[in-house]
Regions:
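Bacterial N-terminal signal peptides that target proteins for export
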Residues: 1-9
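Bacterial N-terminal signal peptides
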Residues: 9-18
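A short, N-terminal "cap"/entry segment at the start of jelly-roll beta-barrel domains
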Residues: 22-72, 87, 154-155
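Conserved short histidine dyad/triad with adjacent acidic residue
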Residues: 61-64, 76-91, 127
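Short histidine-centered beta-strand/loop micro-motifs
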Residues: 68-70, 86-91, 109, 134-135
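Ligand-binding loop in jelly-roll beta-barrel domains
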Residues: 70, 127-153
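Short, conserved beta-strand element in jelly-roll/cupin
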Residues: 77-81, 92-107
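Short acidic-glycine-tyrosine-enriched beta hairpin
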Residues: 112-127
Length: 155
């Protein structure tokens, strides 16, 4: 019986230590300067902001990992397949830039104006502005998404 208690205590200690190591790794991720493709966090989201389909994402880090003093809260490679979209949504205190890498999309600004976007185009929604993006073409729409926030605006 004593051996079982010792083994259980050792297992619990290992579990606590490994959880602490993973927590530290997640916290340190936002100060990391280079992210290899195989290190990226896979995060797919459904029907984003009232849009349709799946938004496929590969992130260096996500906004829940960022510290208040870090302006860039999230960076990710994003992919929308044909028929998929990010619905029209308003940004409160953060800003969201899309850098189009490949494919063709339709960007909708806060006034409801549609603009066709291609590789090399950049869109941005500042705090207080709205935007949306959709893919109506057969080729996937690939873009880099950068979300930044000035936490001083919240005070």
């Amino acid at each position: 019986m004593k051996m079982k208690k010792i083994a259980a205590a050792m297992a619990l200690s290992c579990l606590i230590l490994s959880a602490t190591a993973f927590a530290e790794e997640a916290q340190d991720r936002t100060v990391q300067q280079c992210f290899q493709k195989d290190e990226l966090i896979v995060l797919d989201k459904q029907d984003v902001a009232g849009g349709k389909g799946t938004l496929h994402g590969l992130f260096s880090f996500t906004r829940d990992m960022a510290k208040p003093e870090q302006a860039i809260k999230e960076i990710g490679w994003m992919r929308l397949e044909k028929g998929s979209s990010i619905g029209l949504h308003k940004h409160g205190v953060n800003e969201d830039a899309y850098i189009i890498i490949s494919g063709e999309g339709i960007f909708t600004d806060g006034d409801g104006n549609d603009t066709v976007v291609h590789a090399g185009d950049i869109t941005i929604a500042r705090a207080g502005q709205s935007h949306a993006l959709r893919n109506e073409k057969d080729e996937p729409l690939i873009f880099l998404d950068v979300i930044a926030q000035n936490d001083g605006l919240q005070k």
